[in-house]
Amino acid sequence: MKNGSGNTNTKLILLHPYIQKQTSTTRLWLLAFVSFFTIVFLLTLLYTRDTIPSKNTSVAAAVAAVVTGGSTPSASSPISNSNLPTSAINALLHYASRSNDSFHMSYGEMKSISDVLRRCAPPCNLLVFGLTHETLLWKSLNHNGRTVFIEENRYYAAYFEEIHPEIDVFDVQYTTKAHEAGELVTAAKEAAGNECRPVQNLLFSDCKLGLNDLPNHVYDVDWDVIFVDGPRGDAHEGPGRMSSIFTAAVLARSKKGGTPKTHVFVHDYYRDVERLCGDEFLCRENLVESNDLLAHYVLDKMDKNSTKFCNGRKKRSVSSLS
């Protein structure tokens, strides 16, 4: 546009792209920040729900810590002969049996194992197959003895040992399938005079049901109590508990010292695999207490030349677990 003086005034509107770029960059950073924390929150929620012990387990652990003074026995420290007070044991059983976890054991089942641990001469050697809701309970009840856990999931074993460094956990790889139980048990019975004999060092065993990849010292310990609550046995393609029950039977029969008897507990006894392997390797004449969920056997050590797990004697009188 021209004015009266003949000069041309041009007005320029400058657009500064930096302002737009700065606004866009800020929004992107804000979006990335919100997205990151949303993902972290969801992962934390899922991971906590699936793996962190329940509130009741934590309460039981807290009670145990108070009772034991927060100390745990080690190989370098002497083990005293004192036992947990009855009130502390009852508190542990109470909290553990009232968990919201649908897979927890009943009070009667836990008390049966607890009673045996209380009568066990210290230092008591306890071997447990499986990390479960009751893991901290077993460790606490046997606080003056040695407690070792065998777990099929190496990642969960590492995680559990990280948050509970006082727990001794070893992972093992099972090569069996639950649907192979009948075939494997038959083969083991046929080889009872050779690689699947009841008295042997499983570290050098070729028996398919024997666990031979545990730490060496596990085979050297004279176990007083063995509890089979793992591995997974409720799925057709799961490993089943044939190997853990067979291994428990051999460890009990192969003791070199300590007391001549070993208490072996088998959980989920109502299932076919647990009942079959219990009958064949732990033997009905050794069954002293049972219900649908828990069986309690008492096994004597055997002569090294033994070739039979069971002697065929009449079954003992069996009491019922409440």
UniProtKB/Swiss-Prot annotation:
Alphabetically ordered keywords of this record: Golgi apparatus, Membrane, Transmembrane, Transmembrane helix
Transmembrane segments: 28-48
Topology in the lipid bilayer: Single-pass membrane protein
Keyword match Repeat: no
Keyword Thylakoid: no
Coiled-coil blocks: none
GO biological process, one term: xylan biosynthetic process
Gene Ontology cellular-component terms listed: Golgi apparatus; Golgi membrane
Gene null: resulting phenotype: No visible phenotype; due to the redundancy with IRX15-L. Irx15 and irx15-l double mutants have a mild collapsed xylem phenotype, irregular secondary cell wall margins in fiber cells, uneven distribution of xylan in the cell wall and a lower degree of xylan polymerization, but no visible growth phenotype.
Expression sites by tissue: Expressed in rosette leaves, stems and siliques. Expressed in the xylem.
Cellular localization per UniProt: Golgi apparatus membrane
Pfam family, one: IRX15_IRX15L_GXM
NCBIfam families the UniProt entry points to: A_thal_3515
Functional description taken from the UniProt entry: Required for xylan biosynthesis, but not directly involved in catalyzing the addition of sugars to the growing polymer.
Protein name, per record: Protein IRREGULAR XYLEM 15
Biological source species: Arabidopsis thaliana (Mouse-ear cress)
Phylogenetic lineage: Eukaryota, Viridiplantae, Streptophyta, Embryophyta, Tracheophyta
Gene: IRX15
